[in-house]
UniProtKB/Swiss-Prot annotation:
Official protein name in the record: UDP-N-acetylmuramoyl-L-alanyl-D-glutamate--L-lysine ligase
Residues engaged in binding ATP: G118, T119, K120, G121, K122, T123, T124
InterPro entries: Mur-like_cat_sf, Mur_ligase_C, Mur_ligase_C_dom_sf, Mur_ligase_cen, MurE/MurF_N, UDP-N-AcMur-Glu-dNH2Pim_ligase
Superkingdom of origin: Bacteria
Reaction equations catalysed: UDP-N-acetyl-alpha-D-muramoyl-L-alanyl-D-glutamate + L-lysine + ATP = UDP-N-acetyl-alpha-D-muramoyl-L-alanyl-gamma-D-glutamyl-L-lysine + ADP + phosphate + H(+)
Organism classification: Bacteria, Bacillati, Bacillota, Bacilli, Lactobacillales
Keyword Translocase among UniProt keywords: no
Pathway(s) annotated for this protein in UniProt: Cell wall biogenesis; peptidoglycan biosynthesis
Compartment list: Cytoplasm
Motif L-lysine recognition motif: where in chain: 404-407
Organism: Streptococcus thermophilus (strain ATCC BAA-491 / LMD-9)
PTM sites of type N6-carboxylysine: K229
Length: 481
């Protein structure tokens, strides 16, 4: 619960409060009102709800329906004149985050917070950290793939980083469940939309950076994307940074005055020797490690998670056990066909992650390699060109373009755009299950492989803004083994 006096105090302290307006009268203060619920969904309203009118797509009728349901107060950037008092602020997103923190009694102060950012690898690194910390602690986790608030029960996530009202509610639930740590993926969008405004992490990890999420409804430029990624470093007490990442020199200079560790290329903490499902590390994590996820980039993710968890109370033994136990739904999942051919299912959904995935597959499989790939609609349009550029460096790979969350775009048009950037003939099979069935029928020997990229463990297709039924790549592939 929270009183209106407490709400106004939070907003004024952040210099975000403008005024309360009610029937054309202005108020600097208000008393005698208590809220027991926060919401940004006009369908989730009680008379004692404090409602936040947010988003570019917010419509007056949403607020009118909330008033009909008994709403008495709302927070907004303008007065919608619906007959109830409006708490006006300059930035609704900042207001949501800080009011949520106060409403849930600052649950972040009762947890050790670990956050990962990067163009790729956030989910894998989060799973490594979860398995490491659960050896001796009680971690909760918010990831793109799954969320757990009790360390045992997992449910699907809707956003990489939840909206602030949901985020702090989840934190409070984790605290009530006795959790000691929280592992989060923090996207650039989370900072762009201020979902984590006012939040300081104990450890922040920057895994890598490459062009992605650049488009009309995301980041206008790479510079903007890079800047919002780096905000995690500014808002973390200690940081872990990949010395092999693009623009590392800039980032290293930026964090020079912070408590930090570097890992990877030319750093103290690096993989000394690697052989498929094991590696030897030097530096703070020196020792021999077993790992289920093949590929140098997965070993780097393990190193990043290990260094972060070392700062949060994990022992080297915890780190070794956690890394060995980690598998990730939709990340480098491998099936074997009756003829011995391999099927790799992976979430690789941008040019850089696709390149890393294909490097691993071509290193291990020396026969005919096929790839099924698509691109989502209405987001990350730059990926389509990036995919083409990557595939031009693998001329031997047989490419089938298919549907991958087309949203409000025509999947055929998306596939044709990707194909326009590939300098050889490719096939387009719009039905993703048919594409998988066709490709699997063409892998004939134990050295052959099919790579199904983009959706990972997602058991849905996004069409016209809604999730529609789709069994998922791994389940479809199992049908045709």
């Amino acid at each position: 619960m929270i009183t209106i006096e407490q709400v106004l105090e939070v907003l004024k302290k952040d210099h975000n409060f403008r005024d309360i307006i009610n029937q054309e009268y202005y108020y600097y203060s208000w008393t005698g009102v208590t809220f027991d619920h926060l919401s940004y969904d006009s369908r989730d309203i009680t008379p004692s709800t404090l409602f936040f009118a947010k988003g570019a797509g917010f419509k007056l009728e949403f607020l009118e329906s909330a008033v009909q349901a008994g709403l008495g107060f709302y927070v907004a950037e303008k007065d919608y004149q619906v007959g109830i008092p409006a708490i006006l602020v300059s930035d609704i997103k900042q207001a949501m985050s800080l009011v949520a923190q106060a409403f849930y009694q600052h649950p972040q102060d009762k947890l050790k917070l670990l956050a990962f950012t990067g163009t790729k690898g956030k989910t894998t690194a989060s799973y490594f950290a979860f398995n490491i910390l659960k050896q001796s602690h009680k971690p909760a986790m918010l990831s793109t793939m799954n969320t757990t608030l009790d360390g045992k029960t997992f449910f699907k996530s809707n956003l990489t980083t939840p909206e602030s009202l949901d985020l702090f509610r989840m934190m409070a639930e984790a605290v009530s469940n006795g959790m000691t740590h929280l592992i989060m993926e923090v996207s650039s969008q989370a900072y762009l939309t201020k979902r984590v405004y006012g939040l300081t992490f104990d450890v922040g990890v920057f895994l890598n950076i490459s062009p992605d999420h650049i488009g009309p409804i995301e980041h206008p430029t790479f510079e903007d994307y890079f800047y919002h990624k780096r905000l995690l470093l500014k808002n973390s007490q200690a940081v872990i940074v990949n010395s092999g990442m693009n623009h590392f020199d800039f980032v290293a200079e930026e964090v020079a005055d912070k408590d930090h560790d570097f890992y990877g290329k030319d750093s103290e903490n690096t993989v000394k020797h690697s052989s498929g499902f094991s590696f030897k590390a030097k530096g703070k994590l020196a020792g021999d490690y077993d790992i289920q996820l093949i590929g140098d980039f997965n070993q780097d993710n393990a190193m990043a998670a290990g260094l972060a968890c070392l700062r949060l109370g994990a022992s080297l033994e915890d780190i070794k056990k956690g890394i060995a136990q980690t598998s990730v739904p939709g990340r480098m999942e491998i099936l074997t066909q009756a003829n011995g051919a391999k099927v790799f299912v992976d979430y690789a959904h941008n040019g850089d992650s696709l390149d890393k995935l294909l490097q691993v597959v071509t290193d291990h499989q020396k026969g005919k390699i096929s790839l099924i790939l698509g691109a989502p609609g209405n987001k990350g349009e730059s990926r389509r060109q990036d995919f083409g550029h990557v595939l031009n460096t693998y001329p031997e790979i047989n490419v089938i373009l298919s549907t991958d969350d087309p949203n409000k775009e025509d999947p055929l048009t998306i596939c044709q755009e990707i194909a326009s950037h590939i300098n050889r003939k490719v096939r387009i099979i719009i039905d993703r299950e048919e594409a998988i069935k066709t490709a699997m029928s063409e892998t004939t020997g134990s050295s052959d492989a099919l790579v199904i990229a983009g959706k990972g463990a997602d058991a849905f297709q996004i069409v016209n803004g809604k999730r529609t039924d789709y069994a998922g790549d791994i389940e479809v592939a199992k049908k045709y083994l």
